[in-house]
Amino acid sequence: MINTPPILVDICWTLYRSNTTFDFLDAIISKKSYRLLRAFFKTKVGYRGNILLYRLTHIDWQRRLAIRYLKGMSKAALAAEANSFIAKLEQTKRIGTSFDILSRQQAPIIIISGTIDCIATAVGHRLHAQKICSSTLEYHNGICTGKLKEDILLNKKKYIGIDHFAILTDNTTDVDIVKQAEKAFIVCYSNKDWWEKQHLQHAEYHYEYDQRY
């Protein structure tokens, strides 16, 4: 194991059938205005508008606005809620194939995910991860400001810092990192044809039923 390169591990739709940031927010926030916000972004206008704004500003406005509802929550409370949330995902949305891969590889684990830090930390501790890289919530005196201090959602490559590694992911946006990896384990959904067209000789594909659509 000492000479085994670490494996970079994504979380959302790789370890669990979940967009963990939004599913977590949905689970702990009950305000009507939050529910209306989520409902709007699920409409055709809201969905397409968010995509357009992202292309113009490189900001996921649905995510940014939703995270504001964490304002006023303590870091300790969020950690406790995240641990409870992940425990429930383990029971209902765990992707067994991915955990089998990690068990088989017996490699040091580096969590690298765009999800928020309280969730990534909860997952990382369960997997005894060597390192955890995630989007970081901003706190002031231990209280969440409702803002992101750092967002790595589409900028994971910046945080790797190593030359030799394997990767376990489902994200097409991770393709540049996948190409750098010595070994890649790809969780494929409706994007399986796209992945296969990349002709990644070092990749192992695992097909899952896409429950998002």
Regions found by a protein language model. Give the residues of each.
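Short, charge-rich amphipathic segments
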Residues: 26-36, 49-60, 86-97, 113
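C-terminal cap/substrate-recognition subdomain and adjoining C-terminal extension
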Residues: 2-3, 80, 87-213
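Active-site neighborhood of HAD-like aspartate-dependent phosphohydrolases
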Residues: 1-53
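Short N-terminal micro-motifs specific to bacterial/archaeal maturation
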Residues: 12-15, 69, 169
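Metal-dependent phosphoesterase signature
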Residues: 61-96
